[in-house]
Each structure stands twice: as structure tokens, then as C-alpha cells.
Amino acid sequence: MEQTLKGDETGWWVVSDAVQIWLPQGELPCGTATKWSLQGKTARQIGEWQEQPVWLVCQGRDTDMASVRQLLDQDVGLFQLAGRGVQLAEFYRSHRFCGYCGHEMVRSKTELACLCHHCKERYYPQIAPCIIVAIRRGEEILLAQHNRHRGNMYTVLAGFVEVGETLEQTVVREVMEESQVQIKNLRYVSSQPWPFPHSLMMAFMAEYAGGEIKHDPKELRDAGWFRYDQLPQLPPPGTVARRLIEDTVVLCRAYHENEG
């Protein structure tokens, strides 16, 4: 439930303008509302971290606003809560008015939703399901440079789930569309909320089954097979992409040792 801060409330503070998050000294603020000049602001508790509440304040600040990506090297639980706050701030920003009748909406007091009292419509935060997959061929892993990524970073293939697809069908389709490679022995690994802007990444590993790499230039700048000990620049630690690559490297090394 939302409440007006009196000043003595304490915990972690996710202060977001729906795009960025407030990170004074590069860290998520912790302490009392008064310490961070938040008294009088409207806040909602969105979770707990280290036995302290995590509060969301939907408001920007004049300084120290940054991407939640800066928290990637923090504990995964803290990053997820910060990402949750940014996604909720964006949800509230984009759902001020009802998409059916145009009337102003109110935030639910009992759940994470926006309500229209005029037409009784109810809106929940959107989540975009995505797959991400590491493909192994012997002692090599398929990595690609995505057009949307800056610098020379290579990562595994990924894409959004389409209407009516299973996750497994999405993996096969995305891999074929982006690389023209066939896969086998697909298995689920883990998932990661990804607040850019509101995705849920579902991670898989697979083995190469056939085909020659022919990357889609609309999606990728480059794609190729890389030996486990000759890898290019990789995604940062804390990402599910990095975990997939590291797990695949273990399999590649074991294959090399067994074959050698």
C-alpha cells in the first residue's frame, strides 16, 4: 500500500523517474527517509533486502540519476529489486489514463495494478518473455555481436517469444533466424528478470546439430564459433548471458580434455 513518508521510515530507497534510478555515490541509498530528504513523498514497499524494507518513490532527482545497469555488479537480489522498482515506476507512468475509456486511473491499494473506476478495467505490469541460448559445438561456443550492443562485446543468441509459441519453439526459431544453425538437446538452465524495459529472460543450453552460420545483418554485426580458451569480450558478470557462457565453457573444456 502507498503511504506518505513521515521521515522515520527506514530501508532501501528505489527513487526512479521510470527510466533511471537515483544512485548517490553510485549506490542505492539506505537509511531513513529524512536522511535522504524523502519525507512528504509518496512511497510503496516493493520487497525486502537484508531484513530491511525496499521502498519505491516514483520521482526523479536533479543529480545522480543513472541506469540500473550500474548495480549489475552488486548482489543479484539487490539488482532484481532495483529493477523491479524501475519497471513499476514505468508502469505507473504509462498507465495514468485508461486505454479503453480514457479516464484517469488510480493505483490499487491491494496489488500492483492500476484501476479505472469508470469502466472497471484493471491493468497489470507487462512482462515480455524472452529466450537466451548458449550453443556448443565440441570445444566451441557460438557467440555474436548484436547491433543494439555498444563496443566489441560478443554474447549468446536471444529473442522475444511470439504469440502462440512455446519457449522451445522460440529457441529453435530465433537460432535459425539469426544464425541459420540447427540445434539439439535443448535444456532449460535458469531465468533472470531484465528491466530493459520489462523482460524476463529464460536461459537455455543446446548443442549444435547442423548448418553453416549465416548471421542476420538486421540483428547481428557478426557471429562465429569461438574456442573456450579464445573468447572475445563478454557480457558483464551478474548477467544470465555471462552465466550461460561460463557454464558452456566448462562443458567445452571437459570435451577438450576427454577428446585429447
Swiss-Prot record:
Reactions performed catalytically: a 5'-end NAD(+)-phospho-ribonucleoside in mRNA + H2O = a 5'-end phospho-adenosine-phospho-ribonucleoside in mRNA + beta-nicotinamide D-ribonucleotide + 2 H(+); NAD(+) + H2O = beta-nicotinamide D-ribonucleotide + AMP + 2 H(+); NADH + H2O = reduced beta-nicotinamide D-ribonucleotide + AMP + 2 H(+)
Gene Ontology biological process terms in this record: NAD catabolic process; NADH metabolic process; NADP catabolic process
Cofactor: Mg(2+); Mn(2+); Zn(2+)
Pfam families, per the entry: NUDIX, Zn_ribbon_NUD
Residue numbers binding a divalent metal cation 1: A158, E178, E219
This protein's record includes keyword NAD: yes
UniProt entry keywords in alphabetical sequence: Hydrolase, Magnesium, Manganese, Metal-binding, NAD, Zinc
InterPro entries recorded: NAD-cap_RNA_hydrolase_NudC, NudC-like_C, NUDIX_hydrolase-like_dom_sf, NUDIX_hydrolase_dom, RNA_Hydrolase_NudC, Znr_NADH_PPase
Claim: DNA-binding is one of the keywords in the record: no
Annotated positions binding a divalent metal cation 3: E174, E178, E219
GO CC terms: cytosol
Name of the protein described by the UniProt record: NAD-capped RNA hydrolase NudC
Enzyme Commission number: 3.6.1.-, 3.6.1.22
Domain Nudix hydrolase: 125-248
